[in-house]
């Protein structure tokens, strides 16, 4: 597939990830997907950067992973930090209000129903929202903002998200309600879906489970994503090479994954002991390892016995962690299996492909 880049500018240095073309590592080819330049989008047709580039043939027609297909490596563009800062200042001075016309036209003629997602082709948090929209089967369109044109600073968009970042969502069925921050958006979607259908899909009707879902969701948005973002920034984009910062944030990402790994391992053990009753005594005695159980690769989730937004919120960021030198398949096998199960879901595949 084509790969359109404009490596000369970056308008949000605080999120270095947005400027990185991140390819999949050889060991993680099973769980990396392409956020393609060809994403289906009726509103936007510009060619911004891809977060992950992987051959679409990795996805079989039945939605499973083709483990024999090698991922297409895309080199990271190393641009000196001072040049990026200088270019950002130039961008700030050169924006023309006419460049906002595409955004202005949308706000003058908004749909009557469904959702509009404002995202960016290299924004993991934006794809986090599209995954949940897709899983819930909701009608939505995506506008991929062009940061080089300053569309995220268009007055109409700032009225939706005063932080001038993505994602932001407009719920046209609620009088064009605007929601920003990915965690808040996910909670709005599942709560509204539950209220309207009576089905707690990706959510729970149990208050205790809801509290645990919230805890993991906030852990992802406040710990998991920022630490990966900082590790990428200091590894590839900071004006000076500060090894202590690279090491600090990389190790913090490992610590975060250790928390998730332990939780999933506990869920795995509980599931095996519950379902594999014939061998439970041997597992308890330690004479037979849990890895011998036929349920060792069975999907387990962070909360309860079903997939929720707590799990799905991690998916896009798990796709890029190999670029900071962490191989989750080797270091965190439960995280790897968990991610692979989610990446095989048809709705997730559709969301990441933009279908």
Curated annotation (Swiss-Prot):
Domain GST C-terminal, first and last residues per copy: 206-355
Pfam family, any one: GST_N
Gene3D superfamilies per record: 1.20.1050.10, Glutaredoxin
Domain GST N-terminal span(s) in chain numbering: 113-197
An example Gene Ontology CC term for this record: cytoplasm
Top-level taxon: Eukaryota
Keywords: Nitrate assimilation
GO biological process, one term: nitrate assimilation
GO molecular-function terms, A-Z: glutathione peroxidase activity; phosphoprotein binding; transcription corepressor activity
PROSITE patterns: GST_CTER, GST_NTER
PANTHER family linked: GLUTATHIONE S-TRANSFERASE-RELATED, TRANSCRIPTIONAL REGULATOR URE2
Family statement: Belongs to the GST superfamily.
Subunit structure and binding partners: Homodimer.
Free-text function comment from the UniProt entry: Plays an important role in the cellular response to the nitrogen source. URE2 gene plays a major part in the repression of GLN1 and GDH2 genes by glutamine, and is required for the inactivation of glutamine synthetase. URE2 gene product may catalytically inactivate GLN3 in response to an increase in the intracellular concentration of glutamine.
Protein name: Protein URE2
């Amino acid at each position: 597939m084509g790969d359109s880049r404009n490596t000369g500018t970056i308008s949000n240095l605080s999120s270095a990830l947005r400027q990185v073309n991140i390819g999949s590592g050889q060991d993680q080819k099973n769980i990396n997907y392409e956020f393609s330049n060809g994403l289906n989008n009726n509103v936007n047709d510009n060619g911004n950067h891809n977060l992950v580039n992987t051959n679409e043939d990795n996805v079989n027609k039945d939605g499973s992973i083709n483990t024999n297909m090698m991922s297409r490596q895309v080199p990271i563009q190393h641009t000196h930090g001072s040049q990026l800062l200088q270019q950002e200042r130039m961008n700030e001075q050169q924006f023309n209000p006419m460049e906002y016309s595409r955004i202005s036209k949308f706000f003058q003629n908004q749909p009557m129903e469904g959702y509009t997602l404002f995202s960016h082709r290299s924004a993991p948090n934006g794809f986090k929202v599209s995954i949940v929209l897709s899983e819930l089967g909701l009608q939505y369109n995506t506008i991929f903002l062009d940061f080089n044109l300053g569309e995220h600073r268009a007055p109409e968009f700032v009225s939706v998200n005063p932080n001038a970042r993505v994602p932001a969502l407009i719920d046209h069925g609620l009088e064009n309600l605007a929601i920003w921050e990915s965690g808040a958006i996910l909670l709005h979607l599942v709560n509204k879906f539950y209220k309207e259908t009576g089905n707690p899909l990706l959510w729970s009707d149990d208050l205790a489970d809801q509290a645990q879902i919230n805890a993991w969701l906030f852990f992802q948005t406040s710990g998991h994503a920022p630490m990966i973002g900082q590790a990428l920034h200091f590894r590839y984009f900071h004006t000076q090479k500060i090894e202590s910062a690279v090491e600090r944030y990389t190790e913090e990402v490992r610590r975060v994954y250790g928390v998730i790994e332990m939780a999933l391992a506990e869920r795995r053990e509980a599931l095996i002991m519950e379902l594999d009753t014939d061998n439970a005594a041997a597992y308890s005695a330690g004479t037979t390892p849990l890895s011998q159980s036929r349920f060792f690769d069975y999907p387990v989730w962070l909360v309860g016995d079903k997939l929720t937004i707590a799990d799905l919120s991690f998916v896009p960021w798990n796709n890029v962690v190999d670029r900071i030198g962490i191989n989750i398949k080797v270091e965190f096998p439960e995280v790897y299996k968990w991610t692979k199960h989610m990446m095989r879901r048809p709705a997730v595949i559709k969301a990441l492909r933009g279908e």
